[in-house]
């Protein structure tokens, strides 16, 4: 039986978020709705989840000693990683000493780099993936490109949001793709994955939640990417019954192998009735922001229910819905948003402004959400709303 204590009391149920961006903010809000005490952690002050949490701390989560000390100080009931850049060896060590890591410390370790999860999916579970090679040096990388052929995709094994990712379409791209991958990795360079290009019709995120009563799936989410980062997402993504069955089989296999309770964002490529596994995140997914508008339980509510050992009786999808990203580009610590009256003038629309404290370069600062009669109408409406928001730096 799940028992939730009172925040800021000796009987509190404490959740520590490792990573406090816009996804962590929504997790914090859902956790607080269910009476949990939330401690938000990130590498910079004023991160979105810190703005709503009971307490916050600023540390490098890759600093094993600092992370170990903070967990010992706060004594959380649950540690919930919201990003990949974490000293996962500390989580594995403390999990063996009874700390609850969501979904598991092993899942956090395997998914923090593309090599761990690709080897699990392709080599251990036998899931269909694109042909791939790993390379540590430029010579190994060039051999991998030669073996796989062009076009191929090059990514750092440790990166997110499309950083360091590019497509090699001709021999002229080979050197630049290596250099770009070295600059985009979280560890400052090193190992890359080279993948054959999959000629897919579309790609989806299949949100999969492991909870006390089993495994549940959300309706598939389609999305459009630019420079490796999502710009619009929509739900439901139309797909054949055969493809959906394969997608759910793959999602169940990989999430079962990772174990634990929580929501997973499983990324898949689809061509006709054929499905390829791409990646998985053991946490809410940015493309899943659309579920705030499209479902009775958003991906964040589902994640928190699963973490706390609460049931998920049903996931209701309300019909065509979409999200569209609000981007800022430049340099500022005084970002403001205008023209909101016009942006929110259409029925069945809403905005999330994340509250990120500064912009350096290009940064996702919010998202527009919309419902429509069709997916196409919902996407168009969400884009109109996001385009109407004036970002002032």
Swiss-Prot record:
**Catalysed reaction per UniProt?**
N(1)-(5-phospho-beta-D-ribosyl)glycinamide + formate + ATP = N(2)-formyl-N(1)-(5-phospho-beta-D-ribosyl)glycinamide + ADP + phosphate + H(+)
Keywords, A to Z, come to: ATP-binding, Ligase, Magnesium, Metal-binding, Nucleotide-binding, Purine biosynthesis
> Which pathway is recorded for this entry?
Purine metabolism; IMP biosynthesis via de novo pathway; N(2)-formyl-N(1)-(5-phospho-D-ribosyl)glycinamide from N(1)-(5-phospho-D-ribosyl)glycinamide (formate route): step 1/1
**Where along the chain is Mg(2+) bound?**
267, 279
Q: Where does N(1)-(5-phospho-beta-D-ribosyl)glycinamide bind?
A: 22-23, 82, 286, 356, 363-364
One GO cellular component assignment for this chain's record is: cytosol
Residues the record lists as binding ATP: 114, 155, 160-165, 195-198, 203
Q: Which domain of life is it from?
A: Bacteria
Pfam family for this entry, one: ATP-grasp
* Record-listed E.C. numbers: 6.3.1.21
PANTHER family tied to this protein:
FORMATE-DEPENDENT PHOSPHORIBOSYLGLYCINAMIDE FORMYLTRANSFERASE
Q: What does the function comment of this entry state?
A: Involved in the de novo purine biosynthesis. Catalyzes the transfer of formate to 5-phospho-ribosyl-glycinamide (GAR), producing 5-phospho-ribosyl-N-formylglycinamide (FGAR). Formate is provided by PurU via hydrolysis of 10-formyl-tetrahydrofolate.
**How does this protein assemble?**
Homodimer.
Q: Which family does it belong to?
A: Belongs to the PurK/PurT family.
- Specify the protein name: Formate-dependent phosphoribosylglycinamide formyltransferase
Name the source organism. Oleidesulfovibrio alaskensis (strain ATCC BAA-1058 / DSM 17464 / G20)
């Amino acid at each position: 039986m799940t028992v939730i204590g009172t925040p800021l009391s000796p009987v509190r149920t404490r959740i520590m978020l490792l990573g406090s961006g816009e996804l962590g903010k929504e997790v914090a809000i859902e956790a607080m709705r269910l009476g949990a005490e939330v401690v938000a952690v990130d590498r910079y002050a004023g991160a979105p989840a810190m703005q709503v949490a009971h307490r916050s701390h600023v540390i490098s989560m890759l600093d094993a000693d600092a992370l170990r000390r903070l967990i010992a100080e706060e004594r959380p009931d649950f540690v919930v990683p919201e990003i990949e850049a974490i000293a996962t060896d500390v989580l594995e060590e403390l999990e063996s000493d009874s700390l609850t890591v969501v979904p598991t410390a092993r899942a956090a370790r395997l998914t923090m780099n593309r090599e761990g999860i690709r080897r699990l999916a392709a080599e251990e579970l036998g899931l269909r993936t694109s042909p791939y090679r790993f390379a540590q040096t430029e010579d190994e990388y060039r051999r991998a490109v030669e073996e796989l052929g062009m076009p191929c995709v090059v990514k750092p094994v440790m990166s997110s949001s499309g950083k360091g990712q590019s497509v090699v379409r001709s021999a002229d791209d080979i050197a630049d793709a290596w250099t770009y991958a070295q600059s985009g990795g979280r560890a400052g360079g090193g190992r890359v994955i080279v993948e054959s290009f999959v000629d897919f019709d579309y790609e989806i995120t299949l949100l999969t939640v492991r909870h006390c009563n089993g495994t549940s799936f959300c309706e598939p989410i389609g999305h459009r990417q630019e420079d490796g980062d999502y710009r619009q997402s929509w739900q439901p993504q139309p797909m054949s019954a055969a493809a959906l069955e394969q997608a759910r089989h793959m999602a169940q296999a990989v999430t079962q192998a990772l174990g634990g309770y929580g929501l997973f964002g499983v990324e898949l490529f689809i061509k006709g009735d054929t499905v390829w596994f791409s990646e998985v995140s053991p946490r809410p997914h940015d493309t899943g922001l659309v579920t705030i508008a499209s479902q009775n339980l958003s991906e964040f509510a589902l994640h928190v229910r699963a973490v706390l050992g609460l049931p998920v009786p049903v996931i209701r999808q309300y019909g065509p819905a979409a999200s569209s990203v609000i981007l800022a580009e430049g340099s500022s610590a005084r970002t403001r948003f205008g023209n909101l009256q016009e942006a929110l003038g259409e029925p069945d629309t809403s905005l999330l402004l994340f509250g990120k404290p500064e912009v350096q370069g290009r940064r996702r600062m919010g998202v527009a959400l919309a419902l429509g009669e069709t997916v196409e109408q919902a996407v168009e409406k969400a884009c109109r709303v996001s385009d109407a928001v004036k970002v002032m730096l």
